[in-house]
């Protein structure tokens, strides 16, 4: 669910590298071959290193060595290893949210079913990048990954409010402030569910996360004011 009217704090603003899905993905068809190759090298290197330990522990020197590029080239694409990883993961999360919202809007699905499907998309994302999420979130070792998930869930709840403003509870303060406050409230809880699920021994049951993420939704989010 896009939620672009409410950009999360700390979100990277640079043109992001994305998971390897071909030159046509997310505008990369407009980039020259050298730039696409550099981005692919950075993607592969940061995902490999972040699967071995928290991204905060990765030095620029380690990343450029693993990617086989120099520092000057690196700083043309990002200002830190964490920024490279954020760009990769945000691109995957945003793509899943956008596709889900398009399908949900076309089918006029209720919020609970949308969120259940969204939880399934999140499980797919977590399993796709399982080593790095396990390395970073089990034991709360990576604030970067925690904040990334909070930002994602915040934007997702904002998107539900955009889709149906009647979901926003009445109360003190302007609508924009309440939308932001309630979105953050739900987002922190959902991020906590992710961390709790990841703390389980593998193989983890996707149905457990989907059920918990849906059951934890507050009543005001699934019923109109």
What is the predicted function of each stretch?
Residues 2-23, 158-166, 179-180, 187, ...:
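C-terminal peripheral helix-coil segments that are non-catalytic and often amphipathic
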Residues 49-83:
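Helix-turn-helix
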Residues 58-59, 134-136:
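Short, hydrophobic secondary-structure boundary micro-motifs
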Residues 92-99, 103, 129, 133, ...:
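A short secondary-structure junction motif
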Residues 120, 140-169, 177-191:
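Amphipathic alpha-helical packing segments from all-alpha helical-bundle domains
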């Amino acid at each position: 669910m896009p939620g672009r009217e409410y950009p999360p704090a700390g979100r990277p603003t640079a043109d992001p590298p994305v998971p390897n899905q071909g030159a046509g993905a997310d505008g990369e068809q407009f980039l020259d071959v050298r730039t696409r190759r550099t981005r692919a090298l950075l993607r592969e290197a940061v995902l490999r290193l972040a699967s071995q330990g928290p991204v905060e522990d990765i030095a620029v020197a380690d990343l450029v060595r693993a990617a086989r590029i120099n520092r000057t080239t690196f700083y043309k694409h990002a200002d830190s290893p964490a920024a490279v990883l954020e760009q990769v993961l945000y691109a995957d999360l945003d793509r899943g949210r956008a596709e889900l919202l398009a399908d949900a809007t076309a089918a006029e699905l209720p919020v609970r079913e949308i969120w259940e499907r969204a939880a399934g998309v999140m499980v797919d994302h977590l399993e796709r990048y399982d080593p790095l999420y396990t390395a970073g979130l089990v034991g709360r070792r990576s604030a970067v990954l925690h904040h990334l998930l909070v930002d994602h869930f915040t934007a997702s709840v904002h998107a539900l409010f955009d889709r149906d403003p009647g979901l926003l509870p009445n109360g003190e303060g302007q609508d924009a402030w309440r939308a932001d406050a309630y979105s953050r409230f739900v987002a922190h809880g959902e991020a906590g569910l992710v961390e709790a699920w990841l703390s389980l021994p593998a193989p983890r049951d996707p149905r457990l996360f989907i059920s918990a993420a849906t059951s934890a939704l507050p009543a005001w989010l699934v019923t109109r004011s």
